[in-house]
């Protein structure tokens, strides 16, 4: 069983990542491909980024500086002095739910072995891969050597990595907790796995529907639940009960598992 999450645009650059698992920190597996993309990004002025990414002037200035500061080579690897593990750098609703800062060593190692974080710049990351701050959403139409967008750039590479990481998995099930924008980067027909997509619905005025803020946090919570309980197969996820959610069989099918939360528990 292997989980996929989207990254976050908001980053936590202040809190220090725990050092008791520093021996598990690693370099991104597709970093040489990241270099090719960063070469393109470094050539762009703030005004170019503002137009490309539809961001404010302040954000374009910030990310232009991040791009210029970004550096990786065989002689200049990411370290805890110039980078931070992805699972601790990414912030926002999903990562509030995942809550890696409060995990013990064994739980963080489980997450590292069972979770891939899709990324516009890094392809797919382990949570304990060092990365430097960036902004590049998967849906960005950044022309590159492989095509007009990042889906053309990453598709095959990301899919190969996911298949490799799932090779030793007992049940060959991919739990897709990523957004549509990011999961679109995966070539589904080339995956050697069954795909299950959890859906989180909250009750509002007697109706159950996906509420983005709650659903994002629930995605992180589901990975946390699997890690806390050291789950070994997908079927065990049906017992997921954090934050008041429960599996709803009548609203589920083989490919989409629906978890609901009643209004009284929100």
Curated annotation (Swiss-Prot):
Pfam families: H2O2_YaaD. InterPro entries: YaaA. GO terms for biological process: response to hydroperoxide. It comes from the Bacteria. One of its GO terms (cellular component) is cytosol. This is UPF0246 protein Pcryo_0542. Belongs to the UPF0246 family.
């Amino acid at each position: 069983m292997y989980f996929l999450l989207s990254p976050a645009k908001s980053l936590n650059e202040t809190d220090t990542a725990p050092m008791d698992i520093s021996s598990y920190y690693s370099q991104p597996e597709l970093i040489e491909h990241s270099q090719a993309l960063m070469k393109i990004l470094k050539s762009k002025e703030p005004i170019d980024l503002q137009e490309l990414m539809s961001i404010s002037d302040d954000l374009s200035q910030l990310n232009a500086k991040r791009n210029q500061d970004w550096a990786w080579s065989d002689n200049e690897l990411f370290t805890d002095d110039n980078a931070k593990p992805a699972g601790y750098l990414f912030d926002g609703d999903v990562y509030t739910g995942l809550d890696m800062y409060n995990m013990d060593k064994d739980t963080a190692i489980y997450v590292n072995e069972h979770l891939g974080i899709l990324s516009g710049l890094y392809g797919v990351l382990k949570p304990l891969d060092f990365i430097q701050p960036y902004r590049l959403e998967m849906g960005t139409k950044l022309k590159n050597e492989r095509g007009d967008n990042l889906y053309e750039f990453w598709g095959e590479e990301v899919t190969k990595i996911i298949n490799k990481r799932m090779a030793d998995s007992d049940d060959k099930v991919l739990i897709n907790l990523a957004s549509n924008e990011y999961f679109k980067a995966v070539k589904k027909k080339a995956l050697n796995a069954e795909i299950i997509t959890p859906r989180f619905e909250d009750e509002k005025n007697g109706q159950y529907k996906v509420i983005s803020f709650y659903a994002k946090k629930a995605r992180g919570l589901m990975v946390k639940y699997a890690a806390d309980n050291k789950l070994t197969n997908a079927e065990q996820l049906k017992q997921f009960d954090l934050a008041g959610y429960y599996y709803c069989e009548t609203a589920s099918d083989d490919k989409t598992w629906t978890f609901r939360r009643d209004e009284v528990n929100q």
